[in-house]
């Protein structure tokens, strides 16, 4: 798992790891609560997990785990379906090694930890109309057009399960039925939390994510750069500068 500043895979796994233990950056009122026994326990778990990692994860970005898995350097990582899709595409062109990887691999949902409920963090790509738009109604009409079944179903199929849907009706899309290795992915929109965790969704949550507050805290412990206490203290100070 990436310990470098991997905005997708790195942020995804550390948020799951922390949330699954009951650790949160802020509470429902956006008050910083990262300095907690749950965070300390989560960091102990992350450190133990990182001791099993291959060398180099401290500098991994979002591409490194794909490469490592496809080259059989690792047998477990967190990702969307891009690794599987790459192996499948290469296998279709006659790559025997890629076919071996494709046939042998599978996907799983994130485990539920002591928190007792799914605490996954999947990346959301929002559709937004900016206030400065000169044609807001046209933008809204396009969004409505895109989400109509005759348009969205085709788009969803072409995304080959890399992207999932926010509307229940699209559970019936063929992409979730044609390949058993992709079927469980249709539920990720139901299972994911937002970047704010317990807190609100907005600029502050986005800033904490962009500044890698949680990821850097985990990485500093896993790499031995900081003790658990010191790492939590740094994250707490960073968070309080953002949430004020």
Name each model feature, range by range.
Residues 1-32, 38, 74:
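Extracytoplasmic/periplasmic solute-binding protein
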Residues 81-99:
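A ligand-binding cleft/hinge motif common to bilobed small-molecule-binding domains
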Residues 103-109, 157-213, 218-220:
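Long, aromatic- and glycine/proline-rich binding clefts that accommodate carbohydrate-like moieties
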Residues 29-58, 106, 110:
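Glycine-centered hinge/linker elements that transmit conformational signals in sensory
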Residues 122-135:
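A bilobed periplasmic-binding-protein/Venus flytrap-type ligand-binding module shared by bacterial periplasmic
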Residues 57-71:
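Short helix-initiation/N-cap motifs at beta->coil->alpha
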Residues 71-80:
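Alpha-to-beta junction loops
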Residues 62, 79-84, 125:
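Beta->alpha turn/N-cap motifs
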């Amino acid at each position: 798992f990436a310990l470098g500043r991997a905005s997708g895979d790195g942020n995804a796994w550390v948020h799951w790891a922390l949330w699954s233990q009951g650790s949160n950056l802020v509470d429902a009122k956006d008050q910083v609560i990262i300095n907690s026994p749950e965070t300390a326990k989560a960091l102990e778990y992350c450190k133990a997990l990182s001791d099993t990692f291959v060398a180099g994860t401290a500098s991994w970005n979002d591409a490194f785990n794909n490469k490592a898995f496809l080259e059989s350097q690792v047998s477990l990582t967190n990702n969307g379906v891009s690794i599987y899709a790459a192996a499948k595409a290469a296998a279709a062109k006659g790559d025997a090694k890629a076919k071996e990887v494709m046939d042998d691999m599978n996907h799983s949902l994130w485990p539920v930890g002591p928190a007792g409920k799914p605490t996954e963090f999947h990346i959301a790509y929002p559709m937004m109309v900016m206030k400065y738009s000169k044609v807001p109604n046209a933008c809204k009409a396009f969004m409505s057009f895109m989400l109509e079944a005759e348009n969205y179903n085709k788009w969803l199929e072409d995304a080959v399960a890399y992207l999932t849907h926010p509307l229940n009706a699209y559970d019936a899309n063929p992409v979730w039925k044609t390949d058993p290795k992709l079927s469980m992915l249709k539920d990720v929109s139901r299972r994911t939390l937002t970047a704010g965790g317990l807190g609100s969704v907005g600029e502050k949550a986005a800033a904490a994510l962009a500044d890698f507050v949680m990821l850097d805290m985990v990485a500093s412990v896993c790499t031995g750069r900081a003790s658990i206490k010191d790492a939590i203290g740094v994250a707490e100070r960073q968070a309080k500068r953002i949430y004020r």
